[in-house]
C-alpha cells in the first residue's frame, strides 16, 4: 500500500478524487465482448477494469456432481498478476477463493437454476486492473454476462459498496479510502424485488452508521442497475 495521504476528506467535504461522500465513480458496462463465451461483459468503475465470461448451461462432468433438479453454479474470481502495483503470485489465493464463494451466493438466488437440471453454469471474472471494489464490480459484470448468455433470471444482481472514511460514511470507496478507511460494507441486491443477496461489514461502525452505509450502498446499486440495463438494451434493444 502506498503512503497514506494526509487527508482523505478535505475540509469542504470532498474526497481525494473530488467526489462528494454520496457520489459514485464513473461507471461503464458493455455486454457481449467475448465471441467464444456464451455470455460476457466488460465493466469499468473508476480505475477498475473487469471482464466477466459465462459458459453454459452445459453438461456437468463428472456426472456424480450433477443435480437432478437444478443447475450447479460455479464462480471463479481471479486478479490478473498485473492488476495491482505490488507483485501478485498467479493462481487463486485465499481472498480470491472467498470472493468466488460469496459472489456465487450473491448471484445464485437470481438464476432459475431449476430450468437447467444436470448442467453447470460457469462464471469467470477476471480483474485486469484493480482500484478497490472489485468484488462488487465483478458481481455486477457477471450478472450482465449471465443475461447476455440468455440464462433465465428473476432479476439482474447489482452490487456496490459503502465505507467509513475519517468518520464519514461514503459511497463506493476508492483505493486509498478502502486501504485506510475504518469500515467497508459491500452489498448486492436484486433491485426490482428489493432483495439483498450479499451484505457484509468489515471494520468498525455504529448501528446508525451501518444503517446509513446500507442506504448509500442501495443507492449505488440502483445506479449500477440502470447502467446494466442500458448495456443490455444497447446490445439487444427493447426493455
From Swiss-Prot:
First-tier enzyme category under EC: hydrolase
InterPro entries, alphabetized: ExoRNase_PH_dom1, ExoRNase_PH_dom2, ExoRNase_PH_dom2_sf, PNPase/RNase_PH_dom_sf, Ribosomal_Su5_D2-typ_SF, RNase_PH, Rrp41
Region ranges (Disordered): 1-21
Enzyme Commission number: 3.1.13.-
UniProt feature coiled coil, ranges: none
Cellular localization per UniProt: Cytoplasm
An example molecular function term from Gene Ontology annotations: 3'-5'-RNA exonuclease activity
Keywords: Cytoplasm, Exonuclease, Exosome, Hydrolase, Nuclease
Record flagged with keyword Calcium: no
GO cellular component assignments: cytoplasmic exosome (RNase complex)
BP-aspect Gene Ontology terms: gene expression; rRNA catabolic process
Subunit composition and interactions: Component of the archaeal exosome complex. Forms a hexameric ring-like arrangement composed of 3 Rrp41-Rrp42 heterodimers. The hexameric ring associates with a trimer of Rrp4 and/or Csl4 subunits.
Function: Catalytic component of the exosome, which is a complex involved in RNA degradation. Has 3'->5' exoribonuclease activity. Can also synthesize heteromeric RNA-tails.
Family per similarity comment: Belongs to the RNase PH family. Rrp41 subfamily.
Name of the protein this chain belongs to: Exosome complex component Rrp41
Taxon lineage: Archaea, Methanobacteriati, Methanobacteriota, Methanomada group, Methanopyri
Gene name per UniProt: rrp41
Amino acid at each position: 500500500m502506498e503512503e497514506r495521504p494526509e487527508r482523505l476528506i478535505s475540509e469542504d467535504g470532498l474526497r481525494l478524487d473530488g467526489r462528494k461522500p454520496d457520489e459514485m465513480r464513473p461507471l461503464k458496462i458493455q455486454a457481449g465482448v467475448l465471441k467464444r463465451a456464451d455470455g460476457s461483459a466488460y465493466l469499468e468503475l473508476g480505475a477498475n477494469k473487469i471482464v466477466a465470461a459465462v459458459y453454459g448451461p452445459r453438461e456437468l462432468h463428472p456426472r456424480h456432481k450433477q443435480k437432478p433438479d437444478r443447475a450447479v453454479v460455479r464462480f471463479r474470481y481471479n486478479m490478473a498478476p498485473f492488476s495491482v502495483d505490488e507483485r501478485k503470485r498467479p493462481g487463486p489465493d485465499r481472498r480470491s477463493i472467498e470472493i468466488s464463494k460469496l459472489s456465487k451466493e450473491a448471484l445464485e438466488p437470481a438464476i432459475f437454476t431449476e430450468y437447467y437440471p444436470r448442467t453447470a453454469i460457469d462464471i469467470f471474472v477476471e480483474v485486469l486492473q484493480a482500484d478497490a471494489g472489485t468484488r462488487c464490480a465483478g458481481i455486477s459484470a457477471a450478472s450482465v454476462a449471465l443475461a447476455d448468455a440468455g440464462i433465465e433470471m428473476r432479476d439482474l444482481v447489482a452490487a456496490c459498496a459503502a465505507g467509513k472514511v475519517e468518520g464519514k460514511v461514503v459511497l463506493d470507496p476508492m483505493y486509498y479510502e478502502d486501504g485506510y478507511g475504518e469500515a467497508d460494507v459491500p452489498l448486492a441486491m436484486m433491485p426490482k424485488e428489493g432483495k439483498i443477496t450479499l451484505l457484509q461489514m468489515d471494520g468498525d461502525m455504529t448501528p446508525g452508521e451501518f444503517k446509513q452505509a446500507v442506504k448509500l450502498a442501495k443507492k449505488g446499486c440502483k445506479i449500477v442497475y440502470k447502467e446494466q440495463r442500458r448495456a443490455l438494451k444497447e446490445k439487444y434493444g427493447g426493455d
